[in-house]
Amino acid sequence: WDGNRWRTEDTLAATDLIRSVCRHAAVRAENPKVAAKLASSSTVGGVERLARADRRHAATTEEWDADPWLLNTPGGVVDLKTGRQRPHDRADRMTKITTATPGGDCQTWRRFLDEVTGGDVELHAYLQRMVGYALTGSTQEHALFFLYGTGANGKSVFVNTLATILGDYATNAPMDTF
């Protein structure tokens, strides 16, 4: 847990922590044989195996990023149903995060949308709903969105900007998926 999300631990930080605890216990041990045993690699490995087997430390894959209506941002967690933002909570078990926090005027983005839609306010609103719907992962509407048009009209800029903002939530699917 880094304060905003859970990260995959592949740097052996847990092993380092266990080793440190065992060494600290060895220094405090009065019996030299006990101290040597506590500092041994077999003790460190045994403690690590016990910790891995402890159900209090376990989580199933279904528990991570389980609520499709919560969006994790650097500034907090946004409930996509209400639009409300609240502080991060480790109990949400979120592993993904966007690169931006909602708010601000985004004048450059608005100008871009005006340019590529010809100022069509209804199309702006549609694009906003489309992106919001895509954020949830919900299939309630049975919709699949395609951006269609001639070249150099903003499709790639639109998609790439959203992918950058959405951070860990954005994925690319190869065309042969469809």
Residues of each region from the PLM?
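P-loop NTPase catalytic core of nucleic-acid-dependent motor ATPases
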Residues: 1-12, 63-65, 70, 77-178
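Short, small/acidic-rich helices and loops at N termini and domain boundaries
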Residues: 1-48
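General helical structural elements
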Residues: 23, 53, 94-97
